[in-house]
A protein has these predicted regions:
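Conserved donor NDP-sugar-binding/catalytic core segment of glycosyltransferases
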Residues: 135, 139-169
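A conserved acidic beta->alpha catalytic loop
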Residues: 82-91, 131-134
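Short, acidic, metal-binding catalytic loop of nucleotide-sugar glycosyltransferases
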Residues: 66-75
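Catalytic core of nucleotide-sugar-dependent glycosyltransferases
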Residues: 234, 246-270
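Glycine-rich, basic loop-to-helix element that forms the pyrophosphate-binding segment
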Residues: 105-122
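Conserved nucleotide-sugar donor-binding catalytic segment
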Residues: 170-252
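Short aromatic/hydrophobic "clamp" motif used to bind/position activated sugar donors
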Residues: 127
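N-proximal low-complexity "stem/linker" segments adjacent to membrane-targeting elements
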Residues: 1-67
Length: 288
């Protein structure tokens, strides 16, 4: 009965209030930054930003977060970009809000759009990428910093990771990079913030392999310098069957070809590499 007695102005006010309340609920965010707690670099303790992208991965995101919390190095900024999860992921992010510098949950335009959001939010001198189903070893960031301090002129470090077997993060062979053939894993990848600004962001036109495009632009075009960690200095554990592994290999192969053409590789070489990779993938598929 009371609802019928509300004036038109009051109805508008109630509607606008509910609309504003619902809008606030749509933007789910948390972390230390929302409490006005910001970390800074110092000469002895440079700030390292770790970017994690997640969507509906409540089974592994907790271990990912804990592997950052448990680092022996203390000056870390963890930024987590959630693509609007509908499972228990956001509840886990809320639980660890006092250990995460900033997290946000909202719809995005895919993995690399979310990665770019994280890069734009990063404040550290160095930036690392840690997928939501991957983890670091306890001493990983100390190892990475050791390389940046020892080799002052480098732009990036590729760390050794474990993915069923030990995989070296970087082959510093110019010919391999010009062919866009290399071993590079995001869990072991770290870059100076200033160097990242020079090469820009992931190209979101690529759904599957934008990291390959970025690495190619970084090393072959911008001629940035990097180092690989010693094979005995394991940085982290790269989960098999993650995002990149579960993608349609034909779609991924076609996209790799587009990246080669975009970066103006020799067209004959591009065709040869396409068929070499196609045969390799088909053999893997049928030999299973």
């Amino acid at each position: 009965m009371e609802n019928h007695l509300i004036s038109q102005n009051n109805k508008n006010y109630i509607f606008e209030t509910k609309l504003f309340h619902n809008f606030k609920k749509l933007k789910r965010e948390g972390g230390l930054r929302t409490k006005r707690i910001f970390k800074k670099s110092s000469s002895s303790k440079p700030l390292i930003t770790i970017i994690t992208v997640v969507k509906n991965n409540s089974k592994t995101i907790k271990n990912c977060i804990k592997s950052v919390i448990n680092q022996n190095y203390s000056n870390i900024e963890h930024v987590i970009i959630d693509g609007g999860s509908s499972d228990n992921t956001v509840s886990i992010l809320k639980k660890y809000s006092n250990h995460i510098d900033y997290w946000i949950s909202e719809k995005d335009n895919g993995l690399y759009d979310a990665m770019n959001k994280g890069l734009k939010l990063s404040q550290g001198e160095y930036i690392g990428i840690l997928n939501s189903d991957d983890t670091y070893k306890k001493n990983s960031l100390n190892i990475i910093l050791k390389y940046f301090k020892k080799f002052k002129n480098i732009d990036f470090v590729f760390g050794t990771v474990f993915k069923g077997r030990i995989l070296s993060g970087f082959w510093p062979k110019k010919i391999l990079w010009k062919l866009n053939i290399y071993s590079a894993h995001s869990v072991g990848f770290f870059i100076k913030k200033n160097s990242q600004k020079k090469i820009g962001f992931y190209d979101t036109k690529f759904k599957y392999c934008a990291d390959r495009d970025l690495f190619y632009r970084m090393i072959v075009k911008a001629k940035m310098k990097g180092k690989a960690t010693n094979k005995k200095e394991l940085i982290g554990y790269f989960t098999e069957g993650g995002f990149s592994e579960s993608l349609n290999f034909i779609g991924r192969l076609l996209e790799e070809t587009r990246i080669r053409l975009k970066n103006k590789q020799n067209i004959i070489l591009v065709i040869i590499l396409f068929f070499v990779h196609l045969i390799y993938q088909l053999r893997k598929f049928f030999i299973k």
